[in-house]
Amino acid sequence: MAENRSQSRMHVVWNGAIRLPTLHIVQVKVLNLTDAGMQFSCSENLRIGQKYEMQIHVPDLNGGPNTTVVPCFAECLYVILSGREFRVGAKFSGLSPKNNELLLKWSERCARGVA
């Protein structure tokens, strides 16, 4: 089945964290990204339409040991229960130009099959 999206998904396994409205921090696992958003797994059932403060730990493009912490906001678009976790689809906002460029470089790299 063909995907109906402007940008194909970039499959990743990156760590991240999300701040709940209660100010509790929950660890997440980013599963895939596009230029507009992402899917991640989370132990909490997030609220559709809610905007959450988030951080994504993006690996070094050259395979080095360092990661870049990318702060952003994620607006919850859907939540699907998958086993003991929830799969969450979210739209990005609040990315700095520098961090947006980093994610675009990763996307280009994955499109070339290098990742």
Say what each PLM segment does.
Residues 35, 79-84:
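Short, conserved beta-turn/loop elements at beta-strand boundaries and strand-helix junctions
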Residues 27-30, 72-78:
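Short beta-strand-centered aromatic/proline hotspots
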Residues 1-33, 43, 104-115:
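N-terminal helix initiation/capping motif
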Residues 83-115:
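C-terminal output/interaction extensions
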Residues 10-11, 22-25, 63-73:
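Short coil-to-beta-strand transition motifs
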Residues 57-62:
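Short, charged beta-turn/beta-strand-edge "cap" motif at the junction between a beta-strand
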